[in-house]
Amino acid sequence: MADVGDLKADGSQLRERPSAKPLHLNNSDDAKQKVLKLNDQEDKDHKNDESKKRTYGRTPDGTVFIVPQTHDMVSQLLSPSQPKNLSDIAVLAVLASLILTFYALPKSARVPIFAIIFLFWRAGYNAGIGWLLDGQSKHNRLVLWAKQSHIFEKPETGKNPNPALYKLLKRELETKIPKDYKFEEAPLEYNTWLVFRRVVDLILMCDFVSYCLFALACFNRPQESWFLWALRWTTGIILFLFNLWVKLDAHRVVKDFAWYWGDFFYLIDQSLTFDGVFEMAPHPMYSVGYAGYYGIALMMASYKVLAISIIAHAAQFAFLILVESRHIDKLYNPPPPRLKTFLFVNAFAWRLWYTLGLGYILDRQSKKKNWTKHFIKYGDTKEEAWRQWKSLYHLSMTMSHASFVALAWKMYSLPPDGLTGLTLFRHVLGAGMIALQVWTAMSIYESLGEFGWFCGDFFFDPPSKSLTYNGIYRFLNNPERVLGLAGVWGIAIITWSPAVFYVATTAHILNLAFLQFVEKPHVIKLYGENLREMSGVSKTVRQALPDPVRQWQSAADQYINTTVESIEAMLDRARSKFAGSVDTFVNDTTSLFKSYPARIPISRHHSEDLSGLNLKQYKLEIEGTTLPPAVEQQKNGGREGELARTPAIRTNDFKTLCLEYGAPIRVRWQAPLNHSKKDWIGLYMVTDNQSRKVTRISSNGRWVATNPDAFDSTRADDGILVSDKLLPANDNDEESTDCYTGEVEFHGDKLWWTTGVFEFRYHHGGRHHVMALSQAFEIRIPKFDETDVEVDDNGTIHRAVEETLLPIIQNCFDRDPEIAPSTSEEPFGSLVERDGKFARRVVFAVHQMFGIEFAPEVVQADGTVRNLAWRICNAKKVLAPYSMSATHGRNTPTMG
C-alpha cells in the first residue's frame, strides 16, 4: 500500500505508493477513517486518470489494504488480453461439455434434460451461493473455514497441511492479479473472497449457458403473420439488449466488489454516485436486469422458456430478500424503527381485509344471503343489515386508504438534491395518477349513486334488469379494473419505497381477483345477456387497429377463454379425485398401523469410541452472584405441616446454590489433555433431561465452546475466558495426572430468563455425550418484603424499591453500559426501545418480586429506574384495598 506498511497515523507519505503491504490498525473505526481518507486522496490525485487510481479497503479486524483491480467474469474467461489460469480452463471445459451435450442429445431429450441442468445450476446460484453468503454474513463462516484449514498460511510455518494447494492457489490468484497484489501479504478475508468468486464464476456462467441451450432446445416456429413475427422478434431483441445494458451499466457503477458480494468479506469506504440504471428501478440487477429472459422467451416463442424464466426470476427475488437484503440492512442500515414495521403490517392487513374479507362476505351474500340471514336470525331487518354493511364497507375502505397513506408518509423522504430530474418527473406523474383516481371515484359515485357504490345489488333486487351505461361507464365497462388504483400506484411512484410498491402490487392483484371471482359472477347472474361486451374506448381502439391485429386479438381472447374453462374443469376434477385419494390414504394408513404397531426408535447421537477418556478427569465448578441467606427463609411460608416448619438440619457442609436472576455465571472446567477441541458446555433445566449420560434436548443457543475457532460460528466463542491452561498433577496424589483447565462465562442470551433449577453439562467432541455435570443450582427472584425495609422521609418505600430494582434491571440489560443504567436517574439505552426482550425480562422480574404485572411498553415508556419504581409504588397503593398484607407508610389517602 501507500506504503501501508510505512503509513503514519496522520496519513502522511500517502503519495509515495511503494508497496501493497497491509496496515493493521487498532480497531474498525480507525480503519474506516483511514480508508475514507485514502480513497478521497486518490480521487483528488487521479481525478482525470482512472487507470492510476487505487482503491483501499478494510477488513472487520481493522486491516487496511489495497483492493487490486480485477475484471468481470466474461473478460477473464474469453478476452485474449486477459491472463488465463487453470481455473479458467476448468470453467471453459464445463461450458464446452454443456454445449457438446446439447449437440449429442436427440432433439426429444434436449428440453427435459436441459431444464433439469438449468434448474440445478440455478439452485446452485440461489440456494448454494445463498447458503454460503448467509453463513458468511451471520457467522463469518467462509473466513473461519479458511482460517481453520490454514490453506493461506505459508508452508514454512508447518501449519499448512497442503503445501501443494497453497502453491496452486498462489499461482492461480497472482496470475489473475499481476498488480498491487501479493498472495502471502493479502488479508485472509480478501484471499477467501478471491477463491469464492471463482466458484461464483463457474456457477453463473453455467447458469446462463444452460439457460440459453434450454431456450434453443425449445425454439418454436408458430404459424403467424409477418407483422406478429416482426413484433415478437423486435420486442425480444430490445428486451435482450436492454438486459445487456442494465448488467453492463450496473457493473460500471458497483464494480467487482459488489458484483461478487465483496461486502460480505471486507468493506470499501468511499463516495459513490449511483447513477444510470440505479436511478431507473430498485435493485436493477434483479428486477429489470432479468428482462432479457422474457425477451429470449419471446424470440423462442415458447411458453416453456417463459415458465422457467419466471421460476428463475422468482428464485432470484427470494435470494435478494432472504440473503442480500438482510445483509444490507445489517451492514448499512440502522435497526428499522418499530413504527415502520407496524405501519407496513397495518396497511397490508387492512388491504387484505378490504378485498379478501369483504369479498368473502359479498360472495356468501350473493350465493346464500348469509349477511342478511345473520341479522334476520337475531330479530333485525334486511334494512338494518344493509345499514350495517354500509358502515363496515365505508370503515374498511377508509382504513385501507388511510393506512396506505400513513405507510407512504412514513416511508417517504425527499432526496438530498431536491425535486430535480427524474425525481421531479416521479412526483408530477404520481400526483397526476392520484388526481386520476380521485376523479374516477367521483365519477363512479355520480353514475352509480349510494346503492351502486355500496354494492346494493348484493342485498336487494336491482330496480332494472339492464345496466345503464352513463357517466364514466359510457367509456369503460369497469373503470375500477383500469383506473381504480391509479392513485395507489401514484403514491408508490412518489415514495419509491419497496414496501409501498409491495403493498400496491398486492392491492392491485387482490382487486383484480375481487372483480374476477366476486363481482363478475354476481353481475352475470343478475343481468345475464344484457351486459355490454365491449366498452366505448375498446370499440374505438379496435376499429383503429389493422385487420390482422383484430383477428389476432379475437383468436387470443378465444384461446384464453378456452384455457380458463379447461383449467377450471381440470381443477374441479382434481379436487374430487384428490379428496377421494386422501380418504383412501388415511384409511390404508390407519389399518397399516393397526396391523403393525411397531415402535420405531429414533436416536439423535451416533455411537462413538470414548475409550481413552477418563470421566473422573472431567469437572465443572460454578461461580455466580449468590442471593443473601435471608432468601432461603422465603421457602417456609407457614404452608407446611408442623414438622416441616423448622429449617432442615444438614449432616454435611453442602449448601444450596441460589443465584441472581440474569447475573452472569462463570463455569470453570477441567478435562484430560487428550480431550476434544470441539467440546462444549451447555446450560439446561434439570427437569429437561432424563438421562445423565446423553443430552436429548437442544440448548437453543445456551452453550459455549471450550476452545476458540473450533466451530463454524462466532457465537460459539462468545463467553470463552480461558482455554486449555495446563494444570500440573498433584505430587501428593498418586492418581492425579496433568490436565487442562479453562473458564467460560454465560451471559445475556446464553442464560435462561426464568426461574427454576438448572445445571451445566460438559459435552464431548461436538456431540451430546455428557462427560461431566455441574452442581444443580437455582435461579430465584426474591419477593420484596415491605415489612423488612425502612420508609423514607415522606413515609414511603419509594427509595427501597429503587435500590432493590436497580441491580435487577442492570442484570436484565446484560450489564451493558450502553443500555444499563448505573443510577436510578440515568435513562435506559435506546436499544431497550428497539428490542422488546429487555423490557419483557424486567416485566417478568417485577411480577415475581412485587406481584404486579405490567406490559413491556410500560418499561420502555418510563425510561428510568426511578420512574418505574414510582409506578410500582403507585400500583401498590391502588391495589392496597385488595391486599390483606400489612404495609408501611401511607398507602391510602387520609381524611382530614
From Swiss-Prot:
It is an enzyme of class 2 (transferase). Residues 1-85, 134-198, 247-256, 301-304, 363-403, 449-481 are lumenal. Pathway: Phospholipid metabolism; phosphatidylcholine biosynthesis. Its EC number is 2.1.1.17. It is a multi-pass membrane protein. InterPro entries: Phopholipid_MeTrfase, Phosphatid-EA_MeTrfase_fun. One of its GO terms (cellular component) is perinuclear endoplasmic reticulum. Residues 1-19, 27-53 have a biased composition (Basic and acidic residues). Its main location: endoplasmic reticulum. Keywords: Endoplasmic reticulum, Lipid biosynthesis, Lipid metabolism, Membrane, Methyltransferase, Phospholipid biosynthesis, Phospholipid metabolism, S-adenosyl-L-methionine, Transferase, Transmembrane, Transmembrane helix. Residues 107-112, 220-225, 278-279, 326-341, 425-427, 503-896 are cytoplasmic. It catalyses: a 1,2-diacyl-sn-glycero-3-phosphoethanolamine + S-adenosyl-L-methionine = a 1,2-diacyl-sn-glycero-3-phospho-N-methylethanolamine + S-adenosyl-L-homocysteine + H(+). The chain crosses the membrane at residues 86-106, 113-133, 199-219, 226-246, 257-277, 280-300, 305-325, 342-362, 404-424, 428-448, 482-502. Catalyzes the first step of the methylation pathway of phosphatidylcholine biosynthesis, the SAM-dependent methylation of phosphatidylethanolamine (PE) to phosphatidylmonomethylethanolamine (PMME). This is Phosphatidylethanolamine N-methyltransferase. It comes from Pyrenophora tritici-repentis (strain Pt-1C-BFP). The gene is cho2.
